[in-house]
Every structure is written in structure tokens, then in C-alpha cells.
């Protein structure tokens, strides 16, 4: 029992390294593309309203797909699910690279495959890494994985931006497909670390435990869309300016990547704070700081403040995300139904992101475009404060 629960304590170096390598390659591929997808659609002729509703549909599809995908993960195991999710992303990228104009013929299947891949990976990775569970060092372990992730995601937008500037965004997308193929390879070396052929369990599901942070989980997903897709699109369209020479990709890539050093420093420091039983205080302070960054967004007009705000926001989001994730993993242990529990909270966070995208879409219909984004950021600030409503048993001890 102890061996199964604390897999990372007994795993060989090769088993741990393969997940790290696969994770880094996948995140590199993902951030090569994700930073620029909305900009690419805008260049192709999609309106800002259409882009918002495209993302709303994508997240809504994830809401419907997560639990069936979680069922598959329970059957085949998280490592095999990660492998499958990487392979699914390859045709999605190839289709997306061939999207032409505003035709939906390739865009819809590309986004649906992307949604399936991301949802399957997110749940499978959480199941695998949640088994880190260590009373004294879980914060540090989650922080180290965040450092690996931020190292990759910090450098990828710069690389992707300059490739897009030199050769066009479609080349970046195809390059990402190649990286997804390489990301699958390390997972072929060793077997599944957890028991396979499990089932989703809703009988005696700990709904009370879930409800204690369900509003915060919704807010978590909402905030991901505000800080990521919406902010990137706002900066590209209203601050940098989208032109036909693709320079927007290089500039956006550099602005996104300034968080690289900040994220590494913050992850290490925050991990130590969490392990000193100060996770709740860190989560509260960082949540308030994150809300304040959203309030400032509408007033940014040039690229240098964008870089500063991105760095500040990274401090805030890392500050609440690490202790929040630590507590969610603890809840997954307490629930007794780890796989089902993590699948359900993924549904809630995707619902939050879908509502955020839908709200932005409706604001863009009824209000002038720039004003709609500015109002959306103010609303995002208020919604992000719902993270303060989370009540975790871990932080009551």
C-alpha cells in the first residue's frame, strides 16, 4: 500500500526522468503553439468575438469529454494515457497548420482533437504526480516540477515567436507536432506505475470535500483564460498591433518569456514556504495580488509595462497555484477515489474557462472591442477572488 501511494519515493531515476523529459517536451510543443493560436486565427480573418466563442466551444467540449476520458485513463493507466494524448495532438497540429481563412472544415476537428489531448493529459498527469504525497516535502516536489515546466514554457514562446516571424506561424505548428512525437518516446521505456483497469467511483463520493473548493476550482479555470488567452490577445491586438509581417509573434514571445527567471525563483521559494506550513497564507496573499494585476491590465498601453505586469502576474499565479495544487492532491488522497476526484475537478475548472470565454464573447458583441476587454479584466479580478473561498483540510491542521 505504501509503495503504491508513494510511488515517487521508490521510483528509479529512469522512471522519474522519463516523465520529466516527456513533460518538458510536451510543454515545449504546447507553448510553441498556444501562445500564438488566437493571434493566428485573428490573422486568418476571425473576429475577436468569433475567437472568444471558439474557445468557449473548445472548453465546453472538454467539460463533456473529461469524465469519459478519465474512465479511459482508469482503464489503461495514466502513463499510457499521457502517451495517447501526445499522439492525438500530432494530427491536431497538422490540421491546424492547414487551416485556411475562416473555413471551419479543419479548424473544428483540430480544436476537438486538441481538447481531447489536453484534457486526457491534464487528468493523467495529475493522477501520476499527485502520488508525490509527502507530508514534509510535497511543496518542494511540486515546486521542482513547476521549475521544470516554467523553464520549458518560458523559452518556448521566444523560440516559437522567432520561427513564426521568420517562416510563418504554420511552421511553428508543424514543428510542435514533431516535438509531440518525441515527447511520446520516453514513455515507451518502462511500465505503468499504478494499477490499471480501475473504474470511476461515484458511490460514497466525497461531495462535501469537493464543495469546499468547487467555487475556487471554477475561479481557477476562469483565471487561466483571463491571464492566458484573453491577455495575450489583448496585448497582440491593442498594444503591439497585428500586422502581415508576423513581427507580432516575435514580440509576443519575448513578452511572455520574461516570466522565465521570475517563475523559477518563485517556485523554489514558494515550495519552501508551503513545506513550512504557510501554504494557506501564501495562497491568500497571492490570490489578492493576482486580482490586483487584473485590475491594472486595462491601463497598460505599451510593451515595457506588459513585461513588468507579466512578471508580477507570474509571481501571483505561481503563489496561489502551488499551495492550491498541494491541497487538491491532499484532498485526492483523502477522498479514497483519486482518479474520479481529479476528473471531477477538471470538469469544474474547464467550466470556469468556458464561462470566461463566453462572457468575453458576449461583451464583444455589445461593447466596443477594447472596452469589452478592459471590462472583462475587471470582472476577472472579482472572479479570481473566489479562490479565497477554498477550504482545505490540509490547511486546517
For the regions a language model picked out, list residue spans one by one.
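A membrane-interface helix-boundary motif in multi-pass transporters
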Residues: 165-178, 245-247, 358-384
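Multi-pass alpha-helical transporter architecture, strongest
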Residues: 2, 68-70, 180-194, 375-397
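Substrate-agnostic recognition of the 12-TM MFS/MFS-like secondary transporter fold
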Residues: 18-35, 58-70, 88, 110-164, ...
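Helix-loop boundary and gating motifs at the non-cytosolic
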Residues: 2-63, 209-255
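C-terminal transmembrane helical hairpin of 12-TM major facilitator-type secondary transporters
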Residues: 281-321
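Conserved MFS/SLC helix-loop-helix module at the cytosolic interface between two early adjacent transmembrane helices
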Residues: 64-100
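Helix-to-loop junctions at the C-terminal end of transmembrane segments
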Residues: 65-78, 164, 265-279, 364-365
Amino acid at each position: 500500500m505504501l509503495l503504491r501511494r508513494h510511488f515517487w519515493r521508490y521510483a528509479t531515476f529512469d522512471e522519474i526522468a522519463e516523465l520529466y523529459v516527456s513533460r518538458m517536451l510536451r510543454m515545449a510543443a504546447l507553448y510553441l503553439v498556444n501562445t500564438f493560436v488566437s493571434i493566428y486565427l485573428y490573422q486568418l480573418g476571425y473576429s475577436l468575438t468569433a475567437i472568444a466563442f471558439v474557445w468557449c466551444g473548445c472548453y465546453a467540449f472538454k467539460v463533456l469529454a473529461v469524465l469519459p476520458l478519465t474512465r479511459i485513463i482508469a482503464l489503461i493507466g495514466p502513463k499510457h494515457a499521457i502517451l495517447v494524448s501526445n499522439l492525438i495532438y500530432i494530427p491536431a497540429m497538422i490540421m491546424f497548420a492547414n487551416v485556411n481563412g475562416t473555413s471551419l472544415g479543419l479548424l473544428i476537428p483540430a480544436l476537438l482533437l486538441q481538447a481531447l489531448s489536453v484534457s486526457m493529459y491534464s487528468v493523467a498527469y495529475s493522477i501520476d504526480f499527485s502520488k508525490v504525497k509527502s507530508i514534509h516535502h510535497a511543496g518542494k516536489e511540486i515546486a521542482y516540477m513547476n521549475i521544470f515546466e516554467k523553464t520549458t514554457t518560458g523559452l518556448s514562446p521566444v523560440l516559437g515567436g522567432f520561427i513564426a516571424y521568420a517562416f510563418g506561424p504554420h511552421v511553428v505548428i508543424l514543428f510542435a507536432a514533431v516535438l509531440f512525437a518525441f515527447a511520446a518516446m520516453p514513455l515507451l521505456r518502462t511500465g505503468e506505475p499504478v494499477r490499471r483497469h480501475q473504474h470511476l467511483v461515484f458511490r460514497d463520493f466525497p461531495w462535501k470535500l469537493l464543495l469546499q473548493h468547487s467555487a475556487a476550482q471554477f475561479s481557477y479555470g476562469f483565471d487561466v483564460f483571463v491571464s492566458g488567452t484573453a491577455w495575450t490577445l489583448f496585448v497582440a491586438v491593442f498594444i503591439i498591433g497585428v500586422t502581415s509581417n508576423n513581427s507580432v509573434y516575435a514580440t509576443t514571445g519575448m513578452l511572455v518569456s520574461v516570466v522565465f527567471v521570475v517563475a523559477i525563483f518563485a517556485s523554489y521559494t514558494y515550495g519552501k514556504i508551503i513545506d513550512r506550513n504557510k501554504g494557506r497564507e501564501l495562497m491568500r496573499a497571492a490570490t489578492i495580488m493576482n486580482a490586483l494585476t487584473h485590475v491594472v491590465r486595462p491601463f497598460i498601453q505599451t510593451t515595457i509595462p506588459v513585461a513588468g505586469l507579466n512578471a508580477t502576474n507570474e509571481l501571483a499565479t505561481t503563489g496561489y497555484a502551488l499551495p492550491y495544487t498541494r491541497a487538491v492532491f491532499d484532498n485526492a488522497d483523502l477522498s479514497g477515489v483519486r482518479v474520479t476526484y481529479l476528473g471531477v475537478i477538471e470538469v469544474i475548472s474547464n467550466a470556469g474557462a468556458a464561462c470566461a470565454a463566453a462572457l468575453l464573447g458576449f461583451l464583444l458583441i455589445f461593447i466596443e472591442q477594447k472596452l469589452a476587454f478592459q471590462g472583462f479584466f475587471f470582472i476577472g479580478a472579482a472572479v479570481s477572488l473566489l479562490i479565497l473561498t477554498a477550504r482545505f483540510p490540509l490547511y486546517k491542521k
